Amino acid sequence: MLSLLVIFFIKFEKIEKGESIEQIQSPLIGKNIPNIKIIKFNENQKISFSKYKNKRFILNFFASWCLPCKIEAPLLNKVSSKIPIIGIAYKDKEEDMIKFLKNYGNPFSEIGVDQLGSIAIEWGVYGVPETFLIDENGKIIYKHAGAISHEVYKDKIIPFINND
Protein backbone atom coordinates (compact mmCIF):
# COMPACT_ATOMS: atom_id res chain seq x y z
CA MET A 1 0.00 0.00 0.00
CA LEU A 2 2.84 2.35 0.83
CA SER A 3 4.38 1.76 -2.60
CA LEU A 4 1.12 2.75 -4.29
CA LEU A 5 1.03 5.95 -2.24
CA VAL A 6 4.60 6.76 -3.27
CA ILE A 7 3.76 6.14 -6.95
CA PHE A 8 0.70 8.40 -6.66
CA PHE A 9 2.72 11.28 -5.20
CA ILE A 10 5.48 10.92 -7.79
CA LYS A 11 2.92 11.01 -10.60
CA PHE A 12 1.08 13.95 -9.00
CA GLU A 13 4.35 15.88 -8.71
CA LYS A 14 5.09 15.30 -12.40
CA ILE A 15 1.63 16.49 -13.39
CA GLU A 16 2.12 19.62 -11.26
CA LYS A 17 5.39 20.28 -13.14
CA GLY A 18 3.46 20.36 -16.41
CA GLU A 19 4.23 16.92 -17.77
CA SER A 20 1.29 15.47 -19.63
CA ILE A 21 -0.29 12.29 -18.32
CA GLU A 22 0.72 10.50 -21.54
CA GLN A 23 4.41 11.23 -20.79
CA ILE A 24 4.42 9.76 -17.27
CA GLN A 25 6.17 6.40 -17.38
CA SER A 26 4.96 3.37 -15.51
CA PRO A 27 7.21 1.69 -12.93
CA LEU A 28 6.05 -1.58 -14.53
CA ILE A 29 7.91 -0.94 -17.80
CA GLY A 30 10.39 -3.79 -18.29
CA LYS A 31 8.72 -5.92 -15.64
CA ASN A 32 6.51 -8.99 -15.98
CA ILE A 33 2.77 -8.43 -16.00
CA PRO A 34 1.20 -8.48 -12.54
CA ASN A 35 0.24 -11.98 -11.44
CA ILE A 36 -3.35 -11.36 -10.42
CA LYS A 37 -6.64 -13.09 -11.10
CA ILE A 38 -8.86 -11.38 -13.67
CA ILE A 39 -12.35 -12.82 -14.08
CA LYS A 40 -13.71 -12.89 -17.63
CA PHE A 41 -16.86 -10.97 -18.49
CA ASN A 42 -19.92 -13.24 -18.63
CA GLU A 43 -17.88 -16.29 -17.59
CA ASN A 44 -16.82 -17.76 -14.30
CA GLN A 45 -13.26 -18.28 -15.50
CA LYS A 46 -10.14 -16.22 -15.18
CA ILE A 47 -8.14 -14.83 -18.05
CA SER A 48 -5.16 -17.09 -18.63
CA PHE A 49 -2.15 -15.11 -19.74
CA SER A 50 -0.33 -18.40 -20.37
CA LYS A 51 -2.15 -18.75 -23.68
CA TYR A 52 -0.37 -15.57 -24.80
CA LYS A 53 3.06 -17.02 -23.99
CA ASN A 54 5.44 -16.37 -26.88
CA LYS A 55 2.93 -13.89 -28.36
CA ARG A 56 2.76 -10.14 -28.21
CA PHE A 57 -0.52 -8.65 -27.07
CA ILE A 58 -2.16 -5.44 -25.91
CA LEU A 59 -4.02 -4.89 -22.66
CA ASN A 60 -6.48 -1.98 -22.58
CA PHE A 61 -8.37 -0.61 -19.57
CA PHE A 62 -11.65 0.94 -20.74
CA ALA A 63 -15.14 1.91 -19.58
CA SER A 64 -18.46 2.61 -21.28
CA TRP A 65 -18.72 5.99 -19.52
CA CYS A 66 -15.27 7.07 -20.74
CA LEU A 67 -15.33 9.57 -23.65
CA PRO A 68 -11.66 9.00 -24.63
CA CYS A 69 -12.45 5.25 -24.79
CA LYS A 70 -15.10 6.01 -27.39
CA ILE A 71 -12.63 8.16 -29.31
CA GLU A 72 -9.96 5.43 -29.47
CA ALA A 73 -12.42 2.63 -30.35
CA PRO A 74 -11.96 2.86 -34.16
CA LEU A 75 -8.17 2.50 -33.84
CA LEU A 76 -8.47 -0.42 -31.42
CA ASN A 77 -10.87 -2.13 -33.82
CA LYS A 78 -8.32 -1.62 -36.61
CA VAL A 79 -5.47 -3.00 -34.48
CA SER A 80 -7.45 -6.04 -33.31
CA SER A 81 -7.14 -7.73 -36.70
CA LYS A 82 -3.35 -7.69 -36.30
CA ILE A 83 -2.78 -8.54 -32.61
CA PRO A 84 -4.81 -9.86 -29.65
CA ILE A 85 -6.21 -7.18 -27.34
CA ILE A 86 -7.38 -8.00 -23.84
CA GLY A 87 -9.88 -5.48 -22.50
CA ILE A 88 -10.38 -4.77 -18.82
CA ALA A 89 -13.74 -3.13 -18.10
CA TYR A 90 -13.01 -0.64 -15.32
CA LYS A 91 -15.77 0.04 -12.77
CA ASP A 92 -18.48 -0.53 -15.36
CA LYS A 93 -22.01 -1.89 -15.32
CA GLU A 94 -22.57 -5.02 -17.39
CA GLU A 95 -25.47 -3.61 -19.42
CA ASP A 96 -23.56 -0.38 -20.17
CA MET A 97 -20.50 -2.33 -21.30
CA ILE A 98 -22.62 -4.48 -23.65
CA LYS A 99 -24.15 -1.35 -25.15
CA PHE A 100 -20.71 0.26 -25.53
CA LEU A 101 -19.34 -2.79 -27.37
CA LYS A 102 -22.41 -2.92 -29.61
CA ASN A 103 -22.14 0.79 -30.50
CA TYR A 104 -18.36 1.10 -30.85
CA GLY A 105 -17.30 -2.43 -31.81
CA ASN A 106 -15.56 -5.14 -29.84
CA PRO A 107 -11.82 -5.27 -30.53
CA PHE A 108 -11.15 -7.54 -27.55
CA SER A 109 -10.09 -11.19 -27.69
CA GLU A 110 -11.14 -11.44 -24.05
CA ILE A 111 -12.70 -9.03 -21.58
CA GLY A 112 -11.94 -9.00 -17.89
CA VAL A 113 -14.01 -7.24 -15.26
CA ASP A 114 -12.61 -4.84 -12.66
CA GLN A 115 -15.68 -3.71 -10.73
CA LEU A 116 -13.76 -2.49 -7.68
CA GLY A 117 -10.73 -1.02 -9.43
CA SER A 118 -8.30 -3.35 -7.64
CA ILE A 119 -6.87 -4.74 -10.89
CA ALA A 120 -6.24 -1.21 -12.14
CA ILE A 121 -4.34 -0.45 -8.92
CA GLU A 122 -2.10 -3.49 -9.44
CA TRP A 123 -1.35 -2.32 -12.98
CA GLY A 124 -0.68 1.27 -11.85
CA VAL A 125 -3.67 2.63 -13.75
CA TYR A 126 -4.97 5.99 -12.62
CA GLY A 127 -7.58 6.62 -15.32
CA VAL A 128 -9.12 5.18 -18.44
CA PRO A 129 -8.24 4.47 -21.10
CA GLU A 130 -4.78 3.13 -20.45
CA THR A 131 -3.06 0.75 -22.82
CA PHE A 132 -0.14 -1.60 -22.24
CA LEU A 133 2.01 -3.31 -24.89
CA ILE A 134 3.22 -6.68 -23.65
CA ASP A 135 5.97 -8.62 -25.39
CA GLU A 136 6.23 -12.34 -26.04
CA ASN A 137 8.01 -12.84 -22.69
CA GLY A 138 5.16 -11.29 -20.70
CA LYS A 139 7.05 -8.05 -20.07
CA ILE A 140 5.37 -4.66 -20.25
CA ILE A 141 7.32 -2.63 -22.78
CA TYR A 142 5.11 0.45 -23.17
CA LYS A 143 2.20 2.15 -21.44
CA HIS A 144 0.00 4.86 -22.88
CA ALA A 145 -2.41 6.89 -20.73
CA GLY A 146 -5.32 8.44 -22.60
CA ALA A 147 -6.91 7.70 -25.95
CA ILE A 148 -4.71 6.09 -28.57
CA SER A 149 -3.99 8.71 -31.22
CA HIS A 150 -2.97 8.15 -34.84
CA GLU A 151 0.54 9.24 -33.82
CA VAL A 152 0.77 6.60 -31.06
CA TYR A 153 -0.71 4.04 -33.46
CA LYS A 154 1.92 4.85 -36.10
CA ASP A 155 4.94 5.40 -33.81
CA LYS A 156 4.37 2.79 -31.08
CA ILE A 157 1.72 0.20 -31.93
CA ILE A 158 2.61 -0.60 -35.56
CA PRO A 159 6.34 -1.10 -34.77
CA PHE A 160 5.30 -3.24 -31.77
CA ILE A 161 3.07 -5.40 -33.98
CA ASN A 162 5.81 -5.69 -36.60
CA ASN A 163 8.38 -6.47 -33.87
CA ASP A 164 10.58 -3.55 -34.99
For the regions a language model picked out, list residue spans one by one.
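Thiol/disulfide oxidoreductase modules built on the thioredoxin-like
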Residues: 103-107, 114-164
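A short beta-strand-turn-helix
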Residues: 36-57
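Short pre-active-site segment immediately N-terminal to redox-active cysteine/selenocysteine motifs
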Residues: 55-57, 61-65, 127
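N-terminal targeting signals for export/organelle localization
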Residues: 1-37, 164
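Structural microenvironment flanking redox-active thiols in thiol-disulfide oxidoreductases
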Residues: 70-105, 115-121
